[in-house]
Design a protein with these regions (language model features):
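Active-site-adjacent beta->alpha loops and helix N-cap segments on the catalytic face
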Residues: 1-5, 22-38, 52-57, 76-91, ...
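Active-site beta->alpha loop and helix N-cap motifs at the rims of alpha/beta catalytic domains
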Residues: 1-23, 150
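Glycine-enriched alpha-helix->loop->beta-strand junction motifs that scaffold or abut catalytic
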Residues: 10-17, 36-43, 61-69, 119-124
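Surface-exposed amphipathic alpha-helices with a cationic face
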Residues: 11, 33-37, 87-98, 145-152
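Catalytic beta/alpha-barrel core
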Residues: 14-28, 42-51, 70
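Short beta-strand/loop segments at the ligand-binding rim of alpha/beta enzyme cores
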Residues: 36-46, 94-105
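Catalytic cores of alpha/beta
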Residues: 51-62, 97, 108-124
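Glycine-rich beta-strand-to-loop/alpha-helix junction loops that act as flexible
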Residues: 103-108, 126-128
Length: 152
């Protein structure tokens, strides 16, 4: 299918940003950035607690859209809360004064984790919890969204 055809299809569908988790930043810069920009498509880069400051600043300088702050190296899904170490990570990134907005993802499932994430970021990404609610309400997105909003 190819990356350019993918970007073209995204643009035709109204998609303006994608996450390609296993795409190394250097490969993006060298092989994909020009094509993505041609279709006004943002490639969202992920950072983790293990990503060093130099790499974070490099990502911030060469991308737009937002930076996806992965809350942990664990798999996505519900967490009861964010411990002090994760809070310190969120604060450290906030204090870097990046030009891109920062969104926290992985483990956002309730008001407590949502509020904790938003206290040091521009917002939170809720994936697994939303999929769980879609399954619960048999694909009724409106019911799932209503329930999710009540939870938060």
């Amino acid at each position: 299918f190819g990356f350019e055809a993918f970007c073209r299809k995204c643009a035709e569908c109204g998609i303006d940003g994608v996450i390609i988790p296993d795409l190394p930043f250097r490969d993006y810069e060298k092989n994909y950035k020009t094509i993505a920009l041609k279709y006004d498509l943002r490639v969202i880069m992920l950072i983790t607690p293990e990503t060093d400051e130099k790499r974070i600043r490099e990502i911030d300088a060469h991308t737009d859209g937002f930076i996806y702050m992965v809350s942990s190296a664990a798999t996505t899904g519900a967490q009861k809360d964010f411990d002090n170490r994760k809070q310190a990570y969120f604060k450290k990134i906030q204090d870097m004064n990046l030009h891109n907005p920062r969104m926290v993802g992985f483990g956002i499932s309730n008001k407590q984790t949502f509020d904790a994430a938003c206290s040091h970021a521009s917002g939170a990404i809720i994936g697994s919890r939303f999929v769980t609610l879609l399954n619960k309400y048999k694909g009724d997105a409106q019911q799932a969204i209503t329930h999710l909003k009540e939870d938060l």
